[in-house]
């Protein structure tokens, strides 16, 4: 065999041997366990961490193939979980505790939110600066278990929620407040509060500013409750 051909033959054998060694040393792909995570609401910044973990491969690193199921008005995540239609669910603690009282065998395995994100937002000229000022006013809430902090604040202020003010179920936006159809509206720090600040003030043509608003934060009032947690069935 000519020297030149011998060189290329030896190089080919070396490359093939190296490839076989690399293949032999490479671990077999990890078998992933499929699981489903039910969100409490539609996709929004509230759930950014779960999607970031999918995008960055964190779940796969732990041997999990996670399917994230979007929530909706008619979806109760803890009930979806209890019925076996999801392996895990994200739900506010008070709502899940109500479901437990009703027989749902679910447990909190990860308390994600350490502070409440719920606000009650009013216009500055409404002169609402504390829960006591809701007396005689129309106050919005979404209901569906989202009203527990509000009701606790009303009672802590010495008001009767059935007699001293009007509690109105608001849509999942800030239209009632923007149209001044309520004196105060429920909002989350990571969603609806920003919606107001992204709306245009028709009197100025500029976006509303924080100084145009009064915000009652339930963490300050003392009636805040734990919110987003990851729940699993007791037999998990």
Cite the ranges covered by each PLM segment.
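Short, glycine-/small- and polar/acidic-enriched structural segments
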Residues: 30-170, 176-179, 183-190, 215-218
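A short, ordered amphipathic alpha-helix with a cationic face
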Residues: 24, 139, 221-223
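Compositionally biased, intrinsically disordered low-complexity regions enriched in proline and serine
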Residues: 8-11, 51, 60, 209
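Pocket-lining segment of extracytoplasmic ligand-binding domains
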Residues: 94-95, 172-176, 180-236
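Short, low-complexity disordered leader/linker segments with a strong preference
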Residues: 1-34
